[in-house]
Amino acid sequence: MNNPVLKPLVIKIGGAILEKESALNALLNVISQLKNKQVVLVHGGGCVVDEMLAQAGFTTEKKHGLRVTPKEQVGLISGALAGTVNKAIVGTANSMDLAAVGLSLNDGDMISCTLSTQDLGQVGVPQTNNSKLLDCLLKAKFLPVISSIGALDNGDLVNVNADDAAVAICQLLNAELLLLTDVNGVKDADGEYLSSLNAEQAQKLIEQGVIAGGMTAKVNAALHAAQQLRRSIAVASWQSPEQITQLLDGHGVGTQIQPN
């Protein structure tokens, strides 16, 4: 796995792509054409979670773009992400002959979690643990589809921010990472898309309120990954799945988050 030519590609999806069947199909079609590339999909699904919580009479609270997960909502959120969303993606992928396998972060002891100290309730901080399951699946040419549900050492389920989950899987496999979002990248104060962004620039834009909400969490996760892996991380739009092949060909796509 450490041969750069053979580095797997971790793609994080979420947001509106999960509500737009044609967009998911287009992404999976591009993945199906990457014949010699090992790919792992990591997904969130906040839109589906919000809908299911509302149907159950719960409200949704977020802090700094991160979901607050009260203990009484964990079962419902886990069912939405590891169940409904995960199996829908797997079903679509398998209909396209992609041999998808649905997983959560704690399957095969891949990722261990500790409870977040940010007063977010049952939210986990992911840490790499054991790559054996993913190694076996990728070697056998399966497409792992991983939900952002993990578990603490005592077995309690926790919700993990999907960007953080993707970063952890990326670190576990020493992989390339592409964070797909609803927009073409990160914007500057003038509303123009940035081709690259480092920690100092990001902090300034966050303080100015230019980077806000869910994009704050995404940029912070990408910066963390860039620092840990010592290479740039791409934040790009799911609306242009052809960018994946451009990225693999060495071209810059979206906003490249740079290590210091």
Curated annotation (Swiss-Prot):
Gene3D superfamilies: Acetylglutamate kinase-like
One BP annotation, GO: L-arginine biosynthetic process
Site (Transition state stabilizer): K12, K218
Disulphide-bonded residues: none
A Pfam family the protein falls into: AA_kinase
Domain of life: Bacteria
InterPro entries the UniProt entry points to: AceGlu_kinase-like_sf, AcgluKinase_fam, ArgB, Asp/Glu/Uridylate_kinase
Enzyme Commission number: 2.7.2.8
Major location category of this protein: cytoplasm
Keywords carried by this UniProt record: Amino-acid biosynthesis, Arginine biosynthesis, ATP-binding, Cytoplasm, Kinase, Nucleotide-binding, Transferase
Catalytic activity: N-acetyl-L-glutamate + ATP = N-acetyl-L-glutamyl 5-phosphate + ADP
Pathway: Amino-acid biosynthesis; L-arginine biosynthesis; N(2)-acetyl-L-ornithine from L-glutamate: step 2/4
CC per GO annotation: cytoplasm
Subcellular location as annotated: Cytoplasm
GO MF annotations in UniProt: acetylglutamate kinase activity; ATP binding
Sites where the protein binds substrate: G45, G46, R67, N159
Family membership noted in the UniProt record: Belongs to the acetylglutamate kinase family. ArgB subfamily.
PANTHER family linked: N-ACETYLGLUTAMATE SYNTHASE, N-ACETYLGLUTAMATE SYNTHASE, MITOCHONDRIAL
Biological role: Catalyzes the ATP-dependent phosphorylation of N-acetyl-L-glutamate.
Protein name per Swiss-Prot or TrEMBL: Acetylglutamate kinase
Provenance organism: Colwellia psychrerythraea (strain 34H / ATCC BAA-681) (Vibrio psychroerythus)
Gene label: argB
